[in-house]
Each structure stands twice: as structure tokens, then as C-alpha cells.
């Protein structure tokens, strides 16, 4: 059997010969066509069109499919530019509206300040109390002993305070001989065995999730960075193989919303389907590094290729060579059995066959070869049963990852905080609401049920005036 190097060398020589023959044919044809044009009747040769610049075109033919693709790209670019223009226009409208509101608010504040300044000037000229009444004069003091003058009749001088207005008093001392009105206070009596209410206020300082929610059905363009040979056997979905892709486009969400997840990695698992000749790929987790935040969480989704679920491939069976060896071993087994039977001498009815040394040697060779070939054939069959069909999927394929179930993007820190909070709630279950101690002390340590049980053992006749116990006491 020729080595792989010899086979490759022959192929290279074959291709070299094909290239040389093709080049020579092209040169000869060009020379022939040039001679035919020069031997013409002097007709003017039409000016040939310049060779189109095919730089950037992937395919060798510029057909309708490429033109349609270019048109689609231009339409998508125009739609994106129109969307950005509309967003900028809305932002400018909002800013103009806010500017007008701020201007009106400033004017209103200026008017309020002017009105307050006028009120302050009016209060400085005529001070009044909080109820709008003028400030009362101080009452006259009672006459002192031995005819001393009353302090209230003596003029009192105060130092000048400048233009500072004196604030009105908030309360007045009651006059002589006036009794202040009584004050009534109310105090609630706690009732036992009642449900207590507790109001929980929302923590306004707590912020919501810092990352968006990806709704179900969202999708993004991606590229496979790790291929695999998907197991296409009957139990292939139980023995999946890992794969990985890199998101290369924006995540398209409902209502033309997008999220930039470019560069994120998505872990995959795949198995093969012989009927459709496709590798069925499912997502496992997503990992990103966005603005210094680490995202690593499980997700549910699948991968599609050219509009269909799964990635197209060719089913490969690698047990053909082993099956050929098993067939060869079976063939040798048949030859050995034939040699063994041919070496047996044929005798008539009732006669006894005599075996010679040559017959024994032939039977041994045929039987040994048959047994060895049969064992080798069984071994190759068992080896072939271990092989299963696979669907090879190479890296570099452009695919689309689809998120089947919606999920909330969370950082590693947020997920750790949630686990800590859930663990704390499990360790500290909510306890029942206790009865306040003031209620027991107010009812001498008994609640309503206990008091009814104690009173149920009393006889009401003991508290009547004509009872027997009362007559005995009178004696």
C-alpha cells in the first residue's frame, strides 16, 4: 500500500500538469484570437469596457444574489440611520420642553420671592401674632407693699436694635388669677390575642438591576470558535459534545430594541441527527465582561444555521475499513473449512478410511485457518459495533444564536448577593408575632381565655345576700 506522501505527490504532479495544459491552452487561444482580429477588413474595434474592480467580492460570480445582499445591506444601514435621527430629534424636543419648564419655574420663583419680601416689610412695620391679631400690651403689675410704685408704670427703655424686625411671640404668659384649662390625655389600652400590624417601608436607596432583561425570542449573529464531531447515534442526545461561539452582532430584541453583547462567549452542547443530517446545538451559559462587570450565568437557547434549527453537516461512517477486514477474515474462514473437508478421504459404505500424514496435515491447516479467521472476524465485528455515525462541524461557521427563554442579565456580585440573602432567609425563618408584655401586666398576667377558665369554677350563689354562707357568718 502506497504511503500518504506518495499519494500526495502524485496528486500534486497531476494538478501541475492540469495547470500547465490549461495555461498553454489559454495562451494559444489568446494568440489565435489576436491574429483573427488583426486579419479583419479594417473594421473599427469597439472600445472594451474596463475590467470591474472585484475587490471585496467573496464569490467569483457577481450574480443576483450578491446584488440583493448589497441592496439589503444598504436598506438596513438606511433604516439604522433613520432610527438614530428620530432618536436625536426626540431628545432635542425633550430638552427644549424641559428648558421652557425651567424658565417658567424660575419666573414663578422670582414672583414668589418678591411677594415674600413685601410681606416681610409689612410685618416689620406692624408686627402681628401668628393668628393675625396685633401684639397685646403687657398687663399692669399689682401694687407692691408700702406704697411702692408698680414696675409696670415705670417706663422701660430698650437699646436700639436697628432695622431688624422683632419676630412675633408664639405664646403669652396667662394673667394674674387665671387658671390654665385642664389638659386631657388619652392612652390606648392594649388588647391581647390580636394581630399586630407592621408597616414595611421600601428602601428607596436600593437600586434595580444594572443590566437589561433579554426577552424570549431575542437573537444575535455569532461565529463558531470551536467545532465538534456530533454523535449521531440513537443515544447521541445523552452523550453531547461541548462547543463554543462568539457573539459578533447586536442582540435583536422585540420592538426593534437592541443590546450590544458583541464579544460575549456562549457555551454550547451538541448532538447529531441522522435523519436531517444536522447537528442539534443547545446553549448552556453566557459569559461577558461589560464595563468592568463580570457576567457568567446559565441560559436556555439554541443555534440555527441559514434559517433552520441546527447546523448542516455530512454524516460520516468510519467503520467501513473494519467491516472490510471482517469480510476478509470471513473469506479466509470459508477457505479453511473447504480445505479441511477436501482433505478427508472418501470411502464406500461400510469401509474404514485410513488417514495418512498428508491428510492430517491438510486437515490441520484448513481447520486452524478456519478457526483463526472466524475469531478474527468476530473481533472486527465487535470493533465495528463500537463505531457510530458522526456529523463533523467545523469552526468559523456564521450562525445565529436564539434565546428561547427570557433571562435577566446579572453580574457575579449580584448573583452572590442573592444566594446570600436566600441562605439568610432559610436560616432565620419568620417567627410568629409575640404578645406585648404590657397587655399581660395590665390584666394581671391573664388573657381572656385564662380568665374565663378561672371564673368557670365559681358558683354565682356564693355572691348572693340570701346564701347559706351569709347566714352562718351572721351567727
UniProtKB/Swiss-Prot annotation:
Residues 126-180, 417-475 are annotated as: Disordered. InterPro entries: T4SS_VirB10/TraB/TrbI. Keywords: Conjugation, Plasmid. Residues 444-466 have a biased composition (Polar residues). The keyword Isomerase does not apply. Residues 136-148 have a biased composition (Pro residues). Residues 417-426 have a biased composition (Basic and acidic residues). GO terms for molecular function: ATP hydrolysis activity. Belongs to the TraB family. Involved in F pilus assembly. NCBIfam families: PRK13729.1. This is Protein TraB. It comes from Escherichia coli (strain K12). The lineage of its organism: Bacteria, Pseudomonadati, Pseudomonadota, Gammaproteobacteria, Enterobacterales.
